Structure formats: C-alpha cells, structure tokens
Curated annotation (Swiss-Prot):
Oligomer status and interactors: Interacts (via C-terminus) with host IRF3; this interaction leads to IRF3 degradation. Interacts with host IRF7; this interaction leads to IRF7 degradation. Interacts with host CUL1 and CUL3.
Organism of this sequence: Rotavirus A (isolate RVA/Human/United Kingdom/A64/1987/G10P11[14]) (RV-A)
Keyword Lipoprotein: no
Domain of life of the organism encoding this protein: Viruses
GO molecular function: metal ion binding; RNA binding
Interaction with host IRF3 as annotated region, ranges: 320-491
Location of region: RNA-binding: 1-81
Primary location group: host cell
Motif stretch (pLxIS motif): 485-488
Residue intervals passing through the bilayer: none
Region (Important for cytoskeleton localization): 82-176
Domain notes per entry: The integrity of the zinc-binding domain in NSP1 is important for degradation of host IRF3.
Protein name (record): Non-structural protein 1
Localization (cell): Host cytoplasm, Host cytoskeleton
Length: 491
C-alpha cells in the first residue's frame, strides 16, 4: 500500500497543475522495463519494491513502472522527483518551500474531503471508512528523506516512504530532518490537516505522522561498485567503455546555486507549465574512471595474486607463466581483459622479483616466505595505510643496509624494458643500483599511477554529477580522458 503513489493518483485529478506534476509511471500503463535487481524504495513513487537502474546516474533507485519516464533526482527539469531533492546544507527557508509545495499539491480541507468521501461512497458497502479507500488522505507532511553522499554533495530526497523497517539494499539511507525545522510548527500543520478528516481516519493519520516524524536518523552508507549498473556502458566487455547518460533538461538552465529553490517554481502555475513545455533530453558519453571503480578492480587483482613468482626464475612475465602450480595465474577472469591491469601486474611482480633476487634471497617457486602475505596489498593503492605498510614490510624483509643513517637495498637484477623505462622516468633518467624506502615507494606507485592516477581521480563516476556539471565538462571536453583512449600519462 504505497501512500505517496495513491495520493499522486487521486490528487492528479484536481487541476491542470496537479495533472502535470503528479504524473507517475507507477500510476500509468505498464510498459516493458529492465529487469530489477535490488530491494528498496523507488524515489519517484516512494513505494517499496524491486528496483532497476536509472539511465541518468546508473544507481538503482527506480521501479519498473517509473523507469518509463527516465527521471533522475539529478535532472535539471523540475519534475516532482527533482523538486523533492535538496542539497546540503538545507535551511529552514528551504524546508518552508518544500512544505508549501506539499500543501499546494496535496491540500486537505473540508470541501475536498467531502468530495473524496462522496466519490468513494458509490455503494452501500462503502459507507465504512476503510483505510484502503482513503489512503490518499492519510499522507502526512513529514521531513522524512532518503539521503545519499555523492562526491562532495549530500542529497536528501524527501517523500513519504512506507515500510521503513524493510530491508534496504540501496546506498540511500533514511534521515529525519525535523531538527532543521520547528517541531511544533510541523505538528501544527499536520493537526490542522487532520482536523478535516473523520475521527477514524484522524487516528490513522496521527499514527502515521508521529511514526514518520519522530524516528531516529540512520548512519550514512558507503557507496560500493555494485551500487552502479553496467547497463549504461556502450560496450560491457570493454574495460575502458564509456557510459551513456540521459538527463532531462529545460531551455532555461537553472544554476546549481539555486538547487533547493526548484520546489518554489510551482507557486506560479502558468510559468511552471511554460517551463515544463520547454523540456528536452541531453545525452552524454562519460568516462567510468573514478576511485570507486578503480578500488574494486584492484581489489579483485589483489585476490588473484600469486606471490610465489617473486622467487621464481621464469623467463616469461607473471601473467604468462604456464605449467607451474605455484606461479600460474588464472587469467580467464574478466578483470584481465583490461590491458592496463595486465601491464601493472606484470611490471610490479617483475620489479619485486628483481629486488628479491638482488638482495641475496635464494628461493624457488615452492618457497613459503613470510613476505607473501604483503604482496597482494601492494595493489591496493587506494588504501594508503595498508599500501604503505606492505611496502615497508617488503623493504624490511630485504634486510636493508644502513648507510649514513639511511637504509638501502640493492637493485642489480635484470628487469624488463618497460620496468626499466618507468624506473628511469622516476629516478632522473637512471637505473640506480641502490634504493631507499622512498625510492621504492615512488617506483611502485608510479607503475600504478601511470594508468590509474588515483591522486587526481573523482571518488564516484561522472554519472553522479549534476546536469550543469556535465554540461560544463562537456564544453571543456573533459567527459572523456586519455585513459579511455588507451593512452597513459607518459604517452
């Protein structure tokens, strides 16, 4: 029983403005839709159901029915979902605008209540006040919101969400923003609305209001790679594939500084209808390069590492070893389709082997060494603390020699030409015979930064940018970077 969805259905018939604003895919005819994946609340119609991906941001936040309108909370077009979306920091003035919008779209007064009651009482059996028949009148005005942190912005999507106790498989989390407003003022608004209802319905309204306005906020969730769909990618088999984003826009571009003012547009119905009549869509091809995706890829690589290779004498690179049960790696995983990860893995393993062999460690593929447990962490460049610890443990394992207060290890074992070039590039054009701790860190990090320079990466993919940000980046030709063209920083 989705209260918000029911309210939109019934209140849509009130006037021309409501008919335009409250149009939901969930209340229209069903059309073929993408397969659902996660359980959660559809941001468009607020019902708890199976969710599919959004074509505007790649997150799972829309139900199969609402997906036909392709609405995203990051759109520029001021549809109902966009007008319910607020950015931090939310002020009391912003909340006043939201509450006024609710009362404009979902009014409750004596005349309206009687109208709804008369339309329900078509037969004798409907003389009772059953909640199913009057669900649309039982939607209180609350400051309940689903919240998500994207890059440097926190977004609050206000609405009336039923079944808060159900399992939430999305990165959105429930937040109560009542502390941003006056509790007594909100109570007064709702008591005034409630006073026009029959006594039986008043009890249910009050119960719903207090349960949705007095709950404790939950902690923010961290985004993960699985929160984003692969369906927006041009080629799902290509590791550098671009992502196709569709955004709903209007001819009068609204500045992001005025983000929280979108809900006030409906106060001038004629102007709002004119704005909505100018709506159109913009399509962008954006890079998938970001820390979130990179961390996910290197996490898989770190679990596939065969550390025994650093003691081996194989002539082939790490990924091309065959017929050796200690060093042969399963290269049929999808992650190895990315040529950049193959290069990084081969180069790092070759360099570490050169350090091990140069410092008198005589071993074999089958050797069991204590340093093995740290080799996989050398690929977790996004986890700075863990990565630094792994490099330090490797360096200390090599038994460095103290020279004038600085510890050094040898590097006199043969390395491949690509590793040699990277070492020269980062060591002033030379291949030094000895390396200190900082030199070792510099070379190992350079092998990763050559393709995935996480120091300058966004935290989340560009699909989570606002429409104005996408438009600006597109003008500067920065939606696609060299990494997607298979060029490294050096090239």
């Amino acid at each position: 029983m989705a209260t918000f969805k029911d309210a939109c259905y019934h209140y849509k018939k009130l006037n021309k403005l409501n008919n335009l604003v409250l149009k939901l895919g969930a209340n229209d005819e069903w059309r073929p839709a993408p397969v659902t994946k996660y359980k959660g609340w559809c941001l468009d119609c607020c019902q708890y159901t199976n969710l599919t991906y959004c074509r505007g941001c790649a997150l799972y936040h829309v139900c199969q029915w609402c997906s036909q309108y392709n609405r995203c909370f990051l759109d520029e077009e001021p549809h109902l979902l966009r007008m319910r979306t607020f950015k931090d920091a939310v002020t009391k003035e912003d909340i006043e605008g939201l509450l006024t919008m609710y009362e404009t779209l979902f009014p409750i007064n004596e005349k309206l209540v009687n109208k709804f009651i008369n339309s329900v009482k078509q037969r004798k059996c409907r003389n009772e006040y059953l909640l199913e028949w009057y669900n649309h009148l039982l939607m209180p005005i609350t400051l309940q919101a689903l919240t998500i942190n994207l890059e440097d912005n926190v977004y609050h999507i206000f609405g009336y969400y039923d079944c808060m106790e159900h399992e939430n498989q999305t990165p959105f989390q429930f937040i109560n923003l009542l502390e941003k407003y006056d509790k007594l003022l909100l109570d007064d608004r709702n008591f005034n609305r409630m006073s026009h209802l029959p006594v039986i319905l008043q009890q249910e309204y009050a119960l719903r209001y207090f349960s949705k306005s007095r709950f404790l906020s939950k902690g923010k969730k961290r985004l993960s790679r699985n929160d984003f769909s692969d369906n927006l990618m041009e080629d799902r088999h290509s590791p550098t594939s671009l992502m196709q984003v569709v955004r709903n826009c209007i001819s009068i571009h609204i500045n992001d500084c005025e983000w929280n003012k979108a809900c006030t547009l409906i106060f001038d119905a004629r102007n709002y209808i004119s704005i909505m009549n100018s709506s159109y869509t913009e399509h962008y091809s954006v890079s998938q390069r970001c820390k979130l995706f990179t961390k996910y890829k290197f996490g898989i690589v770190s679990r596939l590492v065969k550390p025994n290779y650093i003691f081996s004498s194989h002539e082939s690179c790490a990924l091309n070893v065959h017929n050796c049960k200690w060093c042969q790696i399963n290269n049929h995983y999808k992650v190895w389709e990315d040529f950049r990860l193959r290069k990084i893995y081969n180069n790092i393993m070759d360099f570490i082997r050169a350090l091990v062999k140069s410092n008198g460690n005589v071993g074999h593929c089958s050797s069991q060494e204590s340093v093995y447990e740290y080799i996989s962490d050398l690929f977790l460049i996004c986890k700075t603390g863990k990565w630094n610890e792994a490099v330090e443990m490797l360096f200390n394992y090599l038994e460095p020699v103290d020279i004038n207060g600085t510890e050094y290890v040898l590097l006199d074992y043969e390395v491949n030409w690509e590793v040699r070039g990277l070492v020269m590039q980062n060591m002033d054009g030379k291949v030094p015979r000895i390396l200190n701790m900082n030199d070792t860190k510099k070379i190992l990090s350079a092998m990763i930064f050559d393709w995935f320079d996480t120091r300058y990466m966004r935290e989340t993919p560009m699909t989570t940018s606002t429409t104005n940000q996408l438009r600006t980046l597109n003008k500067r030709n920065e939606l696609i970077d060299e990494y997607d063209l298979e060029l490294s920083d050096v090239e």
